[in-house]
C-alpha cells in the first residue's frame, strides 16, 4: 500500500502556541489524498472541483462548507478555477471556554455531518471574519494568538448560525436566487429538474440565471446536476449492494443505458468497473 501523505502542524503553524491559522488556495490545485495532524474548516468561494472525503465524492462549488477532522482522508481533483480557504486549527491548543464540540461537527472525532452549505449572506459575513482572522494569525505582536482564537470562535458560531444541509435551504431564508437554485438542484437527485419551472416560480430570467450560475461556478446548470448525480452514483456503487439499474433510478436517470454512458464519460470507467475497483478498498 502506498504511503499516506500527512500534513504536519510544524509546516503550517508559526509556533506550538498558535491554535488557528488560515491557508488560502487561490486557486486550489489538484491535491493527492492526505490526512493531517490538525483539523480544518473548508469554505469554497467560487469555481468547482471534485472533493473526495473518506472515499465519498462531492462535486463542490461556491458555498460548500466542510468540517475536516485530522484523521479524515481527502483529496481534490478535476478542479476548475476552484477558490477556497482552509481555516486550520489544533483542538488541543484552543483555550477559549466555548462549546467547541457542540458547534463543530466531528470535533475531537465525535460523530457529525461533515458537509454543509452557506448562502450568500453567511458567506459574506464569514469572509469578513476570515479576513480579520488571517491578518491576526500572521501577526507577531502580544496577544495575537488570543485575538485569533476569539475570531475563530466568532467564525465557528457564525457558521453554526448560517449553515444548512445541501438540499434544504430554510424556508424563511433571505438567500439569493443562486443559493436557492443550488439547493433545488441538490434536492433533485432522483427527480427531474425543470429550469423553466424554477424561473417561473422565482419570476426571473432563465438566460440571466444561467449566466450567473456559470460565472460563479464555472459550470452550466446541467453539468452541475449531472456531476452531482454521478458523485452520488459513485458513493452508492461503492457502499451499497443495489443493482446498477436501481442506482441509475436513485440518481435521476430513467434509462440505465444512458446512465452508463454518462457515468463512463464522467469517470473514465463503467459503473461495474467502478464498483469492482472501489469494492477492493472496503
Swiss-Prot record:
Protein role: Activates expression of the rhaSR operon in response to L-rhamnose.
* Annotated positions for site Interaction with sigma-70: 246
HAMAP family reported in the protein's UniProt record: HTH_type_RhaR
Question: Where does the record place it?
Answer: Cytoplasm
Q: What is the lineage of its organism?
A: Bacteria, Pseudomonadati, Pseudomonadota, Gammaproteobacteria, Enterobacterales
Q: Which residues bind DNA?
A: 196-217, 244-267
A GO molecular function held by the record: sequence-specific DNA binding
**Its quaternary structure?**
Binds DNA as a dimer.
Q: Give the protein name, as stated in the record.
A: HTH-type transcriptional activator RhaR
GO BP terms in the entry: positive regulation of DNA-templated transcription; rhamnose metabolic process
Q: Does the keyword Cytoplasm apply?
A: yes
Residue span, HTH araC/xylS-type domain: 179-277
Q: Which keywords annotate this record?
A: Activator, Cytoplasm, DNA-binding, Repeat, Rhamnose metabolism, Transcription, Transcription regulation
GO CC aspect terms: cytoplasm
Q: Which domain of life is it from?
A: Bacteria
Name of encoding gene: rhaR
Amino acid at each position: 500500500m502506498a504511503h499516506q501523505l500527512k500534513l504536519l502542524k510544524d509546516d503550517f503553524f508559526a509556533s506550538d502556541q498558535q491554535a488557528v491559522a488560515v491557508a488560502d488556495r487561490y486557486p486550489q490545485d489538484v491535491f493527492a489524498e492526505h490526512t493531517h495532524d490538525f483539523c480544518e474548516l473548508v469554505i469554497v468561494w467560487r469555481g468547482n472541483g471534485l472533493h473526495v472525503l473518506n472515499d465519498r465524492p462531492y462535486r463542490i462549488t461556491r458555498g460548500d462548507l466542510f468540517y475536516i477532522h485530522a484523521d479524515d482522508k481527502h483529496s481534490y481533483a478535476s478542479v476548475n478555477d476552484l477558490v477556497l480557504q482552509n481555516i486550520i486549527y489544533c483542538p488541543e491548543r484552543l483555550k477559549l471556554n466555548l462549546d467547541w464540540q457542540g458547534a463543530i461537527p466531528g470535533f475531537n472525532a465525535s460523530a457529525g455531518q461533515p458537509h454543509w452549505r452557506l448562502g450568500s449572506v453567511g458567506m459574506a459575513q464569514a469572509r469578513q471574519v476570515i479576513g480579520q482572522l488571517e491578518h491576526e494569525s500572521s501577526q507577531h505582536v502580544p496577544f495575537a494568538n488570543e485575538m485569533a482564537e476569539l475570531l475563530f470562535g466568532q467564525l465557528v458560531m457564525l457558521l453554526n448560525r448560517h449553515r444548512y444541509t445541501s438540499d434544504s435551504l430554510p424556508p424563511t431564508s433571505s438567500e439569493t436566487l443562486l443559493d436557492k437554485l443550488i439547493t433545488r438542484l441538490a434536492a433533485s437527485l432522483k427527480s427531474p429538474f425543470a429550469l423553466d419551472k424554477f424561473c417561473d416560480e422565482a419570476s426571473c430570467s432563465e438566460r440571466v440565471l444561467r449566466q450567473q450560475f456559470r460565472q460563479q461556478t464555472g459550470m452550466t446548470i446541467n453539468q452541475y446536476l449531472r456531476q452531482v448525480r454521478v458523485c452520488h452514483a459513485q458513493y452508492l456503487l461503492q457502499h451499497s449492494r443495489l443493482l446498477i439499474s436501481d442506482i441509475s433510478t436513485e440518481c435521476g436517470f430513467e434509462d440505465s443505458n444512458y446512465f452508463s454512458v454518462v457515468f463512463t464519460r464522467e469517470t473514465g470507467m463503467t459503473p461495474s468497473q467502478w464498483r469492482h475497483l472501489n469494492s477492493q478498498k472496503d
